[in-house]
Amino acid sequence: MGPIYYTVDSIDGDYAHMTSDSGVENQVAMFLLPEGTTVGSRLVREVLEWRLA
């Protein structure tokens, strides 16, 4: 499985709400995401790790 790209739509307390490029919505705990993640950030999930794109 290749990388999946997401855009952070909103942050609600300890969770980021994001949408993948294919339109799938996801909610992820902020502590799992890279430092500096904000609304509008582009993230890549690959091999169970997150990084800023």
Q: Which ranges hold each PLM region?
A:
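Structural detector for short beta-strands of small beta-barrel domains
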Residues: 1-11
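Beta-strand/loop nucleic-acid-binding surfaces
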Residues: 24-35
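Short, Lys/Arg- and Gly-enriched loop/turn segments at beta-strand edges
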Residues: 47-53
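Short aromatic-glycine-enriched beta-strand elements
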Residues: 14-18
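Glycine-centered tight beta-turn/hairpin loop motif at sheet-sheet or coil-to-beta transitions
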Residues: 1, 21-23
